[in-house]
Design a protein with these regions (language model features):
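Active-site rim helix/loop that mediates acceptor-substrate recognition in acyltransferases
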Residues: 37-58, 63-64, 72, 120
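Conserved acyl-donor/pantetheine-binding loop and adjacent beta-alpha core of acyl/acetyltransferases
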Residues: 77-128
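Conserved acetyl-CoA-binding loop-helix of GNAT-fold acetyltransferases
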Residues: 136, 142-152
Length: 152
């Protein structure tokens, strides 16, 4: 879809969190298979809370008052003191541990976390910030929204 006007970029608000979780779900839906819907929901929330703990900045792109893209950046391995997000992450981690499918998907999640740690510890590429998550809705891709989010 060709946009008639430029999208607006702003900091995220609490009302945007359900839509950000939906973007995370859409991003990983094609990569992981779920037999049960609650496993997909819990893993999505676990990823969301992990991102929110280690976030530095969360920016959303809006077009016609609709959120069409999100960028979550973080600095290193030092997260925010976010007790709410940490408690929710622990809760969903435990709920996933209780099911066979959840344990299988947690293995993939742990591999992702290990790769992320290796990239942040690497001395060859010291970066001031990391992109934790970047997503633009499929209908709005190829319009420079991702580039605009990165420039913010």
């Amino acid at each position: 879809m060709l946009l008639k006007k430029e999208p607006a970029y702003r900091k995220t608000e609490k009302e945007d969190f359900p839509l950000i979780r939906e973007f995370i779900r859409r991003n990983y839906k094609d990569r992981w298979e779920f037999e049960e819907a609650h496993t997909e929901k819990r893993l999505t929330r676990l990823l969301f809370y992990t991102y929110m703990i280690s976030r530095d900045k969360v920016t959303v792109a809006t077009y016609r008052d609709q959120v069409v893209g999100v960028l979550i950046t973080g600095k290193g391995s030092h997260g925010h003191f976010a007790p709410f997000f940490r408690l929710k992450k622990g809760y969903h981690f435990l709920r996933l541990k209780l099911t066979r499918e959840g344990r299988k998907n947690l293995e993939h999640f742990n591999k992702l976390q290990d790769m992320k740690k290796q990239l942040t510890v690497s001395q060859e590429n010291p970066a001031p910030g990391n992109i934790l998550f970047l997503y633009v809705s499929k209908d709005y891709r190829r319009n420079g929204i991702g580039t605009g989010l990165l420039k913010q």
